Amino acid sequence: MTRFVKVGTGGGETTWHRAMLDLRPGDVLLLEPGFYALPQGKMLADVTIKGLGASPEDTRITSFFQVDDASSRIIFENLCLIPYKDSNTLDIPEGVDSFVIFRNCVLRGTGNKTTTLAISGKATVELIATKILNGTVSFFKTADFRLEMADSIIDYVSEEFGTLSLEGHGTAIINNSKITGTLNTFDYCNVELDIHNSFVGNLNMGGKTWLNMYKGQTGQDNSYSLYARGDCWLNIMDSVFPTSLCLADRARVLLHGSDAYSLQLKDDSQITFTNTLVRASANFEDRAKGDANRVTFYGNGDYQYFFYMIGKSRFKGRNLTFKPNGAPMLVGDEAKLAANALYSNEQPLEVECANKNNVSILGIKWTLIKK
C-alpha cells in the first residue's frame, strides 16, 4: 500500500531520519526544501523521493544509495543529490532487475574516478530533464541495460575517464541532450546506441556497437570526433564532426548529409557516403574501402594531400567535387581509385601515383606528378 510521507521540520511532518528508519516499499517521500544528510547511506526498494521546492537545488540530499535486489522501481524527482565523501550516488549491483528514474534532478559528482551512477545489474535508467555535474555514468561489463536520456546534461570532461561508459549488453537512447566529454563503448560490449539532436564531446567506440546518429554534433577540443573499431556499424545522417572521423578494424559507416573535418580509414574498414563535405583530407590505408556519391573533398592546407590512398585501399565515386586549394592527391602503393567528377576548382587536378593504371578520373582534367 502506498504511503505519502511528508518530510520536514514543521508541525505534523516526519523528520528525515525517522522517514529513513521507517522507509517501506511503496512509500512516496515528499521533502520540504532544505538540506538532508544520511552519511551511512541507504538501500532502496520501490520508493519515490520527491522534492517540493521550486527547483532541484532547493532540496539537497548528501548521501549514497544502493538498489535492493527486490526492487522493481525507484524514482527521484526535483532533487539535488550530492555523494557523501568518495562514493557513488547510486549503485545498481549485479543481481538487481530494476527501473530507475531521475526526473528534473541535479546530481553532483566527485570529479574523480568514482562514478556518479554505477550500473552492474539489469536496469532501465531514465534521465529526464536531469543534470549530472562533475560526474560520470558507467554501465559495467555485467550490465544488461536500457538507458533513456532526454533533455539532460552530463557535464564532465576528463582525459582519463569516460563521461558516459557503456559496457555489457544494452541500448542507449539519447535525445535532445548534451554529453560534454567522451562517450565510450568497449571491445567486449554489444550495444545499440541512438543519438538524436544531441551534442557529444567525442565518441570512442569498440566491440559490437550499432550506432544510429541523426543531427548529432561533436566537440572541437579533441584530436578526433569519432573513432570506431572492432565490428562497429554506424548509420549517420545530418551530423557535424569538427575534427577527424576515424575507422579501424572492420568498422562500417553509412554517412549521409554530414560535414566532417577529415576522414581516416585503415585496416578493413569501409565507408559509404553521400551528400557530404570533407573539409581537410580523406585518408585510406591498408585495405580500407570507400564508396562516395555527391561528396565534396576540400583541401585546407592542414595536410600535405587533400586525398590520400596507400596500401591496398580502394575507392570509387560518382558525381564528386574536388576543391584541393593547392594540395595534390596521392594514390600510392597498390591503391586503386575510380571516379567521375562534376567539378574541380583546379584543373588539371594534380595526382601523385605509383601506377597510373590504378587511377581513373572522368569528367575533369587531371595530370600525373612526381614527388
Predicted segments with their positions:
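Right-handed parallel beta-helix/beta-spiral solenoid domain characteristic of secreted/periplasmic
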Residues: 7-13, 46-91, 109-110
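Long, polar low-complexity repeats
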Residues: 250, 268-269, 277-279, 285-287, ...
